[in-house]
């Protein structure tokens, strides 16, 4: 272990204050650089944040009291949020599969959570609830709030509470949440913006239920509840890596605050939240907490009860983002091998646990089978050398520097990697260091496989997002250990490295926010008002090229049959059917009328704003083409 200066309580308090002030300064400068100066969105952001915190906190509090290992007792409320992130959505999913409406299940889950919190405290007495470290909790909360504000920069800049970024995945997420507010997950409702959850998204019901529940609690549309829940997930990921560094890597809680700040301000965390990659973000948020609880259960510091929390988070990862599931499993297996120990459930878990898990598995059979299918497809692609792998919206290999938060090419990545190696050699407990080192070596080999084929760009991004986050946490651990070293030269080096990382992260994050603003501006959501003003039963042709904008336009026109002459094809998205026959045309304002006249569009605009225009379509006499517009979408 690296020699460090002994610290008094007051010195540790000053350390935490400095960390909070540095994060606040970073957030303020970044907000000024990106033009995020509008507070009009604040009331709705507060409503969405409170709703997400209530959902996770109430769902996870009793579990945190029951399962929290001694090492995490001082920051138990943070663990409650992490466990509630899994427990609440899973409970809603189980009840939803039984066709109980969300309007009933959400109050039921919250009341059950409150009752369970009261029961575990009453049953265990004072000794069941260890005292909290108020100073650490306040500092952790302050860092978390600041990191959340950074993730919400698109809202501060636009003054609008809506989905950020450019990834059309958000259309399917919001549509799925809106459907679950009114129907069970296997239902079809053609009058909604998304009439059916696509089969390829069949494992992700819990994370759609979470958004639907937050929307109900806050009174916001799922569009409005989306950014605050994404911000909370990003914050939980950052705090999870900080807790992992503080408790497992041996850095201490206040050193872990620095790691949390570094992780939360890194490009990967911000990019997942604002692009956004909703499914991947959920797995990413659960990853560090699963690793931490698994380590504490295996090494004996967390007792066997930590294994239950680890298993719950692994289940969430498997359903939310099946491709991530092998990563924590590989790391945990290597931990068990290094420690020469097998995971054990607590006595009460061994008595009723197997039966409970079997029942849970039977109820969740459909999403579990969808997750297994996804994993098997990915595995079959990887074992064929040179074979193609899944593609997506990443069409070129992203520079290594982005994955360690600094931007740039291989050089900054090598510096952070060197710090990570230093941490493994000098800071992290030996057996854990062996397990993590072996895991990183395996992940490096996998990256070589992905970079040997042109189609590997998308999966390489996914892979390095998870691997890089672990390297960042280890690298920050190494830098903090240098900063706290007895030798002045080492402390200066640590400070310089952290400052250089901060400058690089500031530049990269600024570029990220310039590229990702609000995906659904007011002009786009105004189409919903136009739809309500149209005569019932009339149809609309969406004359918008293939894009996420077309999908959102169809979402807002859900009350009317729609079609498109250029629908979004060859994706995992439900989309309007192909067709040219309709009563109205919705087009981009920049498209001149003369280009639309050959498609029957005529007359002055019925509705228009700065981006879109709605006009009548006049079908030529003698037309024999059948109607093509439909309320039912084409499933991928």
Regions found by a protein language model. Give the residues of each.
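Short hydrophobic alpha-helices at membrane interfaces in multi-pass membrane enzymes
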Residues: 296-315
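Transmembrane alpha-helical segments
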Residues: 320-324, 371, 446-450, 478, ...
């Amino acid at each position: 272990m690296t020699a460090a200066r002994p610290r008094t309580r007051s010195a540790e308090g000053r350390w935490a204050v400095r960390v909070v002030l540095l994060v606040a300064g970073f957030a303020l400068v970044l907000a000024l650089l990106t033009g995020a100066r509008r507070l009009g969105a604040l009331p709705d952001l507060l409503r969405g944040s409170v709703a997400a915190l209530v959902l996770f906190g109430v769902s996870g509090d009793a579990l945190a009291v029951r399962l929290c290992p001694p090492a995490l007792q001082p920051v138990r409320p943070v663990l409650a949020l992490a466990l509630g992130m899994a427990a609440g959505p899973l409970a809603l999913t189980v009840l939803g599969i039984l066709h109980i409406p969300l309007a009933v299940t959400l109050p039921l889950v919250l009341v059950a959570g409150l009752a369970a919190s009261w029961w575990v405290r009453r049953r265990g007495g004072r000794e069941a609830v260890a005292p909290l470290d108020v100073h650490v909790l306040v500092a952790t909360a302050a860092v978390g709030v600041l990191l959340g504000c950074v993730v919400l920069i698109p809202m501060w800049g636009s003054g609008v509470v809506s989905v950020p970024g450019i990834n059309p995945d958000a259309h399917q997420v919001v549509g799925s949440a809106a459907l679950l507010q009114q129907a069970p997950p296997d239902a079809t409702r053609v009058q909604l913006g998304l009439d059916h959850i696509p089969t390829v998204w069949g494992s992700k019901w819990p994370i759609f239920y979470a958004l639907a529940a937050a929307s109900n609690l806050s009174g916001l549309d799922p569009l409005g509840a989306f950014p605050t829940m994404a911000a909370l997930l990003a914050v939980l990921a950052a705090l999870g890596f900080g807790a992992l560094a503080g408790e497992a890597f041996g850095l201490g809680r206040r050193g872990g605050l620095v790691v949390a700040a570094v992780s939360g301000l890194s490009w990967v965390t911000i990019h997942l939240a604002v692009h956004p990659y909703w499914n991947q973000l959920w797995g990413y948020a659960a990853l560090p907490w699963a690793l931490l609880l698994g380590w504490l259960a295996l090494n004996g510091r967390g007792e066997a009860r930590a294994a239950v929390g680890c298993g719950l988070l692994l289940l969430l990862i498997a359903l939310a983002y099946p491709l991530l599931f092998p990563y924590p499993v590989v790391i945990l297996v290597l931990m068990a091998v290094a420690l020469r120990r097998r995971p054990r459930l607590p006595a009460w878990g061994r008595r009723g646990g197997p039966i409970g898990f079997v029942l849970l598995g039977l109820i969740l059979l459909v999403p579990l089978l969808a997750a297994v299918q996804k994993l098997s497809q990915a595995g079959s692609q990887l074992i064929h050398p040179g074979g193609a792998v899944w593609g997506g919206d990443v069409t070129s290999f992203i520079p290594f520097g982005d994955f360690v938060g600094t931007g740039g090419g291989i050089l900054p990545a090598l510096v952070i990697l060197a710090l990570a190696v230093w941490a493994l050699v000098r800071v992290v407990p030996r057996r854990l260091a062996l397990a993590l080192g072996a895991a990183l070596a395996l992940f490096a080999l996998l990256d070589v496989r992905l970079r040997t084929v042109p189609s590997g760009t998308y999966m390489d991004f996914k892979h390095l997002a998870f691997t890089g986050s672990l390297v960042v946490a280890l690298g920050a651990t190494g830098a903090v250990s240098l900063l706290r070293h007895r030798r002045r030269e080492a402390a200066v080096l640590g400070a310089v490295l952290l400052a250089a990382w901060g400058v690089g992260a500031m530049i990269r994050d600024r570029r990220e926010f310039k590229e990702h603003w609000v995906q659904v501006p007011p002009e786009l959501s105004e189409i919903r008002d136009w739809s309500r003003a149209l005569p019932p039963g009339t149809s609309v042709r969406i004359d918008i090229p293939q894009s996420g904008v077309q999908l959102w336009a169809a979402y807002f026109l859900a009350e009317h049959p729609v079609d498109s002459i250029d629908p979004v094809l060859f994706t995992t998205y439900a989309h309007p059917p192909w067709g040219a026959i309709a009563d109205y045309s919705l087009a981009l304002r920049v498209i001149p009328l003369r280009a639309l006249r050959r498609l029957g569009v005529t007359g002055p605009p019925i509705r228009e704003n700065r981006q879109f225009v709605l006009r009548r379509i006049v079908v030529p006499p003698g037309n024999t083409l059948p109607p093509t517009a439909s309320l039912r979408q084409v499933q991928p």
